[in-house]
Amino acid sequence: MGFTPSYKVGVEFINEPYRSVIQGLRNALISVWGDNLVSLVVFGSVARGDARRDSDVDLLIVGKQLPKSRFKRLELFEEVEKLVEPLVEGLWSQGYYIDFTPIILDVEEARRHRPIYLDMVVDAVIVFDRDDFFRKVLDELSSRLLALGAERKRVGKLWYWVLKKDYRPGEVIEI
């Protein structure tokens, strides 16, 4: 059966009330990070459109001139998060318990194909993407997966990937 690359580009593909807070987050990132913001990508249940009221918002943020420390990167994100706190608190008062779960990578780190990208080729929403950086990463990965004959198999509400149909034990598959 295979898979069809079907990630989307544009915040309009995110359902409310998440869309408003993600637009606010995008604007805050642009304001604080400026030209150092490369990409903002939403993935997971919010991107798929099946988020619950208590779902976290999974984010991939790609930036330039980031500190090496993961904790320092999170501090940079917290600076941005403070700017959207009123939006988040407003949603909490409406019964939407939103928390952000960011993965923050520099450009070189983001270029390397990561297992988390597998599902992104199918259901991510790219909200901001300077010079189509992350779109190119996902297109490259999609091409590789299609060349391998990869399949995303569904079992009830869950799924898994078969990267190569004729896989032999011990064989290394590079994506």
Language model regions located:
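Catalytic core of pol beta-like nucleotidyltransferases
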Residues: M1-N36, A47-D54, K64-I175
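Short, glycine- and small/hydrophobic-rich beta-strand elements in well-ordered beta-sheets
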Residues: N36-V42
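Conserved G/P- and acidic residue-centered "switch" motifs that form tight phosphate/ATP-binding loops
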Residues: G44, D58
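Short beta-strand->loop micro-motif that forms the acidic, two-metal-ion catalytic signature
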Residues: L59-G63
